[in-house]
């Protein structure tokens, strides 16, 4: 099961790194998105599978593939992938277990953020700020996924060169195989759904 989780997390990393078109704002499994015709056909199957697994959940039945994805939305996706928990029971235990003053305990994402912070999968934008509504970058998504599968144990993904370390690790693992390294900045800038 642990290897399956690692495989699924890396598969998601590849989808996000190559397309940056993945969203946390999907509807419940088995339902149609009211804007599914805007989903890039090459990613339809991945979206369908991850929705069916409960990894993608959301509100209003919209997928919004052209919208940017927030740090809170990615936290929800990473939590579901890392734990296999698509409910809220475990997550509810962590709503106040973080140092972030901008993550209220009653926010829908508070438990995800708290769990991932304690698991050392996410970091704040500062020691006390998470910026949940801020757009996430491809580098940040890759860092979270790599931490979820066991990388960055020695805090390599910190400091002024953290993006270089993330890209280097992802390249070594083959996640960025088809992306020219001179274009990492363009490709991994803002992640869209």
Segments from the language model and where they lie:
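Conserved glycosyltransferase catalytic-site signature
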Residues: 193
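Feature responds to low-complexity, polar/acidic, surface-exposed segments characteristic
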Residues: 2-42, 53-72, 79-110, 119-139, ...
């Amino acid at each position: 099961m642990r290897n399956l989780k690692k495989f699924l997390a890396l598969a998601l990393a590849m989808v996000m790194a190559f397309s940056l078109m993945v969203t946390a704002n999907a509807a419940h499994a088995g339902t149609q998105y009211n804007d599914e015709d805007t989903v890039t056909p090459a990613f339809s199957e991945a979206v369908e599978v991850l929705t069916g697994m409960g990894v993608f959940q959301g509100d209003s039945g919209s997928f919004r593939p052209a919208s940017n994805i927030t740090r809170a939305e990615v936290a929800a996706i990473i939590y579901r992938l890392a734990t296999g928990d698509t409910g809220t029971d475990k997550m509810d235990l962590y709503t106040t277990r973080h140092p972030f003053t901008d993550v209220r305990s009653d926010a829908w994402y508070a438990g995800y953020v708290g769990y991932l912070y304690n698991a050392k999968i996410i970091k704040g934008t500062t020691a006390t700020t998470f910026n949940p509504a801020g757009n996430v970058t491809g580098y940040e998504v890759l860092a979270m996924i790599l931490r979820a599968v066991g990388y960055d144990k020695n805090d390599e993904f910190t400091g002024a060169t953290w993006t270089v370390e993330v890209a280097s690790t992802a390249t070594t693992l083959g996640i960025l195989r088809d992306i020219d390294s001179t274009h990492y900045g363009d490709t991994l800038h803002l992640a869209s759904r």
